[in-house]
Amino acid sequence: MIKPLGDSALLIQLGEEIDITINQRVHTLNAILSAASFNGILETVPAYCTLLVHYDPLILTFDQAARWARGQMERMDDTTRRTPRKLEVPVRYGGVSGADLEAVAASKGISPADVIRLHSGREYTVYMMGFTPGFPYMGTLDERLVMSRLETPRTVVKAGTVAIAGSQTGIYPLDSPGGWHVIGWTPLKLFDPASETPFLFVPGDEVKFIPLPAPKLDDHA
């Protein structure tokens, strides 16, 4: 489905739920559209199950942009899917920057060590980027860690904080407000505006969290 979004964008909807297969199709289509040169197309923005396409309304009408997008969609197949990058993220769980670890464990009737084991025991896909520059929305959590957001968000969550909410996990790239349960911290820099590649993650990446022993990393408070 392709529909207009304002007077200078169109939205391509490939599904209606958070699903890895749908999300992979989004990223496949995004790669195709990004590689195709077409006068008037400005930018593409992938999300969970949609792809937003910005165009210049002085050059293209909605119908022209949609017709081009449909033509590119016909090129979608398994052979065009980008091979995902695999990234490891070191994490110090608990401590000041992982202050919700024990509360998460208690609410689930498991130990903090179990939370760490479950969180670090699988690979996550970066479904999309958003909220603040470089924030990766990743899934899917083990169902035993699925939790609602905090009733009262924090006014400040430190950059590098690893958190969970719903069936997702993410990392705060900047000091910012946040309503997710914070369970750890990573020393990796997720956003560097001075770099030619300012974002550590891109949609479609596969991420594995690696627990760090406490003595190897100073607490990030």
Predicted segments, located by residue:
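Glycine-rich active-site loops that engage anionic ligands at enzyme catalytic sites
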Residues: M1-A221
